[in-house]
Amino acid sequence: VFCGAEISPDCTTYYKDNPPYREFLILGINPEVLHRDGLSLLKTDQRGLFEWCNANGALLVQAHPYREICTPGDPEYLHGAEAANLHPLHNSKNSKALRFCKHNNLIGTGGSDFHFPLGIGGGILLPRAPKDEADLVALIKSRDFEIIGSRWHARKNYRL
C-alpha cells in the first residue's frame, strides 16, 4: 500500500458558492512529505499543486473530471485524469474523461472511488508490483498498465 491523497483545494472545494468544483489525486507521495505540507496544499491552486507534485516526485491526477458539477482542470497542470472512475453510485461520464485524456495526452487512470464497501474493486493493473512510491510513479508514467473494471462496471480491461 502506498500513500496518496484526494484533495479539493479551497479554490475548487464544493463548499464554496460558485464553480469550478474539482478534486485531485496526488499519487506516489512520501507520507512524511504529505504530512509536512498537506495543510498548505489546501490553500493553493491547481498550478501550485502541480508544481508541488513535480518538486516532490508525485503525480497530479484529476478525479472524475466530468462527474455532475465537476469540470476538467487545465490540462497543462495535470499529469493525468481518471479515464475510468468506477464509483457505483455516480455517473462520472467516463467516455468524456477518456476523450479528455487522449485529446490532451494525459495519463488516463482508473479508480474504484472506494469510500465504502460497496465501491470495492476496479483500478489499474500494473505489470509488476512497485517497490516504492517513486517506482509507482515511474510505472504510471510509463502508461504500461491496464484499467480494470469492477463488479458494478462490467467491462473488459483496457489500455489507453
Regions found by a protein language model. Give the residues of each.
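A residue-level signal for conserved active-site and pocket-lining positions in enzyme catalytic cores
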Residues: 1, 60
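A short, structured active-site edge motif that brings together acidic residues
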Residues: 2-11
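Charged catalytic cores and adjacent phosphate/nucleic-acid-binding surfaces used
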Residues: 10-33, 59, 66-160
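Binuclear metal-dependent hydrolase catalytic cores centered on His/Asp/Glu-rich metal-binding motifs
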Residues: 21-57
